[in-house]
Amino acid sequence: MSSTSSPPALVMGGAGFSYQLNPNPESLPIVDILLRAFELGVRTIDTSPYYEPSEQLMGAALSDPRIQSRYRRSDYELMTKVGRIKENEFNYSPDWIRKSVARSLERFGTTYLDVVFCHDVEYVSLDEAVTAVGVLLDFQRAGVILRVGISGYDIDTLAEVARLAREKYDHPVDVVQTWAQLTLQNTQAETRGFDRFRAVGVNSVFCSSPLAVGLLRTGGIPLGLTGDWHPAPQGLRAAAAEAAEWMDKHGGEENLCSLAMQYAIVKAKQNCTPSFSVSTITGISTLSDLEQNVVAAKRVLKAAGDSENLLDYTELDSQSVESRLALCERVRLMLGEWLDYDFTGKKPKTLDGKSAREVKMPGAVSIAAADDRDLKQSAAVGVLV
């Protein structure tokens, strides 16, 4: 939806249709989910070949007559990835990148992809990542890819790959995607990432996993065929569970899941400028997930008129945001020492180089913004909920 003037408040993450998060994704009513998502104004889809079999399932759904009779290809955006194949298998070679893009085009039955990301760039060398970006830029010049991106968790690596790519090709990386770095538990995308990305020409950031990969919700992390893959240590899990229980008792119409979603959406919107956009990607695998996420978003956004379409909700509802400050403050206080905990085990750093646990983080208890890398069981790291 390149014609949309405002960045999407919510992007549908396709990892919900993967074996990592669902033992039987083929059984999901994906056509119904996509139809309802499009009706509600969730028109951008993010996935990856790594989220097997998400691309195949969504490609088949998008070719269904019920969707094709109502929506043109230009009515929605498709974002996918290249380079990551399995949990411990990557292929960033130019030949494979080209094959992967061609395969995604075939699976989606389209002649172009809106965004293609190099997937989890921190797991390969800087040279491999930069070379892969160059291959995607070739596709961009041919009109096959509209925007070129890189994705991963590590902000330092993302910023360095973007810098090196711009230096080598005299063309910026258009888009960055990072996961679990703009949440109630971790705001390092804001405190350490956005300024660095802007400085090297990035104009759009997608922050996925607003629930910290399923951590910030009642019931704990989701389990797929890969079992308990979550990188959070037990202390953080316990703090999140305590916060979820407190929200169930005292959160009123909100639970920890909806509050975390709203916090991420508000943070994203507050960091948007006319030349730099931030959006939230959330995993969706059921109609209930979709409806609840859209309702949560609308509670902190406002539209010019009475509309069901989330695309019309382009501004923050300042009164609603203000009313949630105390809840956000309480949850972040309960997370305590685990604020900005890095899932890779690295100590988070502020811009002045100090450990984030050695200083009081700006906005540590406020929703308002100021104007070993090989993870165990990482099959779902970057699989986003």
Predicted segments with their positions:
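Beta/alpha (TIM)-barrel catalytic core signal, keyed to glycine-rich beta->alpha loops juxtaposed to Asp/Glu
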Residues: 121-384
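N-terminal binding-site loop/beta-alpha segment at the start of enzyme catalytic domains
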Residues: 1-76, 383
